[in-house]
Amino acid sequence: MEVILLDKIAHLGDLGDKVVVKSGFARNYLFPQGKAVMATKDNLAAFEARRAELEAKLADVLAAAEARAAQLSALTNVTIATKAGDEGKLFGSVGTRDIADAITAAGVPVAKSEVRMPNGVLRSVGEYDIVVHLHTDVNTTVKVTVVAE
């Protein structure tokens, strides 16, 4: 199924790109989320009429993400206190929700879906560099320190 993208989508394309996707992906994700429309002559003409508005909206979202990234890079360190054993092994783990809550408490609102932990949850005391993915083009790193209570 050929669709016109109304938003930048990772691993698929940018605003205004005409791409071929599977029907289920279009029907179940792209169309309900408002991220794409079917590639017909009428929709193509309507998109070209709205192109400037959509590009301005996309630029505003990018600027907001860059502003949040600047706030996050201003944070020197985020500390999370949790229960740990004698050797520094945590009772439990520190995951994306814990990190997002700690960063939000430090003054910058972050959703748990924006916190990226490719190596999995943190299970020991120490300092970690955590990637925060704010936009498809904006990533920043936050230093998180896990300490024992």
From Swiss-Prot:
One of its GO terms (cellular component) is ribonucleoprotein complex. Keywords: Ribonucleoprotein, Ribosomal protein, RNA-binding, rRNA-binding. PROSITE patterns: RIBOSOMAL_L9 (PS00651). GO terms for biological process: translation. InterPro entries: Ribosomal_bL9 (IPR000244), Ribosomal_bL9/RNase_H1_N (IPR009027), Ribosomal_bL9_bac/chp (IPR020594), Ribosomal_bL9_C (IPR020069), Ribosomal_bL9_C_sf (IPR036791), Ribosomal_bL9_N (IPR020070), Ribosomal_bL9_N_sf (IPR036935). GO terms for molecular function: rRNA binding; structural constituent of ribosome. The keyword Ribonucleoprotein applies. It holds the Pfam family Ribosomal_L9_N. Belongs to the bacterial ribosomal protein bL9 family. Binds to the 23S rRNA. This is Large ribosomal subunit protein bL9. It comes from Tolumonas auensis (strain DSM 9187 / NBRC 110442 / TA 4). The lineage of its organism: Bacteria, Pseudomonadati, Pseudomonadota, Gammaproteobacteria, Aeromonadales.
